Amino acid sequence: MEDAGGGEETPAPEAPHPPQLAPPEEQGLLFQEETIDLGGDEFGSEENETASEGSSPLADKLNEHMMESVLISDSPNSEGDAGDLGRVRDEAEPGGEGDPGPEPAGTPSPSGEADGDCAPEDAAPSSGGAPRQDAAREVPGSEAARPEQEPPVAEPVPVCTIFSQRAPPASGDGFEPQMVKSPSFGGASEASARTPPQVVQPSPSLSTFFGDTAASHSLASDFFDSFTTSAFISVSNPGAGSPAPASPPPLAVPGTEGRPEPVAMRGPQAAAPPASPEPFAHIQAVFAGSDDPFATALSMSEMDRRNDAWLPGEATRGVLRAVATQQRGAVFVDKENLTMPGLRFDNIQGDAVKDLMLRFLGEKAAAKRQVLNADSVEQSFVGLKQLISCRNWRAAVDLCGRLLTAHGQGYGKSGLLTSHTTDSLQLWFVRLALLVKLGLFQNAEMEFEPFGNLDQPDLYYEYYPHVYPGRRGSMVPFSMRILHAELQQYLGNPQESLDRLHKVKTVCSKILANLEQGLAEDGGMSSVTQEGRQASIRLWRSRLGRVMYSMANCLLLMKDYVLAVEAYHSVIKYYPEQEPQLLSGIGRISLQIGDIKTAEKYFQDVEKVTQKLDGLQGKIMVLMNSAFLHLGQNNFAEAHRFFTEILRMDPRNAVANNNAAVCLLYLGKLKDSLRQLEAMVQQDPRHYLHESVLFNLTTMYELESSRSMQKKQALLEAVAGKEGDSFNTQCLKLA
């Protein structure tokens, strides 16, 4: 969770803490997505995020969960989780694929999203939040150049038509319940298989996908590769958008009884070369305003190679080699070895806030709530980005379903042959990341199932030589692999998550070793420039660090504190600039398990490191650590003094504000505590209407009077005017 006030937070195990840099540009594009998001929750909306926050998002997030540490909570879980879903491409993602960082309560939390190689982050959505780049494709891929002629046997290659088709409007019929985290000091590290519906439960953070600033560091990008596919795709693949390419049908399924149906991949010789200069005209359109469109095209092609690189398994490599070397006939692939996804549920998600308003405030009040839904935006990536940026994640899930249905992968299509494109994979990534963010883990698992281990041959560009000529690598965003691995820990299977993360780490380590030896990512000979090689090394070091971070969070969830601390120390090697935040997180883990002396030692190390840094954030970090140290010793008066000092330096620091109110409560000053929280919410509702703050406030209302319902309903009205349909109403305790 990101506190707009400059608060800090530490990673918490529970959140794929669930999925957008600027030149010099290539390097910038590489690493915003890779920044670690130490806890992906944010107190504020995108309007409150500024570009300046990108430089210290990690420090700001370390305190988020400690903010909730001494909460009065009837639920053991604690974790803030409003985050941005970052852009969905590695190059376009801001700093951090939404990845979690150590949480204040001592629990590092994975934030999502999805090394967010993109938006929402590989989504992919860490801390600054801004839909990373408006790279949403507005030109239908089907409008690309058509070949002059096509053989009589040629059939059109399946093409995503999400830009030209509009799904019929669907009426809302309720919403899927979602579970929210409730702030508590020690609950963040508890590994529970599945929390009962009525318990407030933390949800993974998709940090920084929702801000308007282009420069931000967040792990949401770690979680999500930007869901907006680059318009440059037509350069490396001019015919990708052609509705009727002159290539023979890439997939033919001869029905054979008693055994899996093999899929025939026909040879490239049947393809008729395009005879018109349309692809070149398309390139000119894409690069309008560029001084050197060819240089730009080559640059983007290099970024594609770098970001898409992956090492397939032996079986998959054999199929791809056969496709690449075929001369005549077809390459047969067992149907069971292909990816055949489809929607597993198509019900409209609805709006829980409006349902509560109907129940408690009446139809007249409920009619005043106006939020975007899947019918009120453009049926394309542009509309999807709009819904996500407005925090209408449930509507975004619905729109993803419509776009996938237009692509032939809708409800009831699971198990049927289909072809994949960069668009369809990005849509699946965003949909799955949103489901995880909303706490619908079982739904996400069902829809992830057809993807297997994400290594089927039809998930690689080489499998479609006529659609993506010359392009190599995996269509699967890196952050989608992280999300696939982390999902199991939210379903009560942390060991399975750890095993999957180890496999991803092995591939990342091998690719990095190849690059450092002067080879290409796949181990072959490389003609890449030295500058390009260094950029690739930085990218894969960052990705490897992201995997280590997820492993540390998983170990923390398993309560293996020794290995978790070792893993966090190893992350410092990959992210040395984030050493103060990581050390603070490790210190708070020590606080959570009651090791005060070790915590004090780490906090002293943080103070030494921050002495070399200039600026307000370093001082706030040291003061926050001191406050938490006193909080862990039940010295509430001294802790309140430190929190108050932080507020003098940064009056908008939500973490300090919330914790100061909690300290007042434990000092027996309930009225003062209530006044502080109420003033905070009234001062800036868009910034402070955070689930953890509201949970504390409603709990204090219950302590203050048996007639707390009226005040809770007033909070509901405030929420209705500011929040989207993703808001978890359980924090209002109205049910």
Swiss-Prot record:
Phosphorylated as the cells enter mitosis but is dephosphorylated at or before the onset of anaphase. The phosphorylated form recruits CENPE to kinetochores more efficiently than the non-phosphorylated form. Changing residue 627 to V: In PEBAS; uncertain significance. It is found in: Endoplasmic reticulum-Golgi intermediate compartment; Nucleus. This is Trafficking protein particle complex subunit 12. Residues 1-204, 237-276 are annotated as: Disordered. TPR repeats lie at residues 545-578, 580-613, 620-653, 654-687. PANTHER family: D-ALANYL-D-ALANINE CARBOXYPEPTIDASE (PTHR21581), TRAFFICKING PROTEIN PARTICLE COMPLEX SUBUNIT 12 (PTHR21581:SF6). It comes from the Eukaryota. Residues 34-50 have a biased composition (Acidic residues). Component of the TRAPP complex, which is involved in endoplasmic reticulum to Golgi apparatus trafficking at a very early stage. Also plays a role in chromosome congression, kinetochore assembly and stability and controls the recruitment of CENPE to the kinetochores. The modification Phosphoserine is found at residues 109, 184. It is linked to Encephalopathy, progressive, early-onset, with brain atrophy and spasticity: An autosomal recessive, progressive encephalopathy characterized by central nervous system atrophy and dysfunction, spasticity, microcephaly, global developmental delay, and hearing loss. One of its GO terms (cellular component) is TRAPP complex. InterPro entries: TPR-like_helical_dom_sf, TPR_rpt. GO terms for biological process: COPII vesicle coating; endoplasmic reticulum to Golgi vesicle-mediated transport; Golgi organization; metaphase chromosome alignment; positive regulation of protein localization to kinetochore; regulation of kinetochore assembly; vesicle tethering. Component of the multisubunit TRAPP (transport protein particle) complex, which includes at least TRAPPC2, TRAPPC2L, TRAPPC3, TRAPPC3L, TRAPPC4, TRAPPC5, TRAPPC8, TRAPPC9, TRAPPC10, TRAPPC11 and TRAPPC12. Interacts with CENPE. Keywords: Deafness, Disease variant, ER-Golgi transport, Nucleus, Phosphoprotein, Repeat, TPR repeat, Transport. Residues 13-22 have a biased composition (Pro residues).
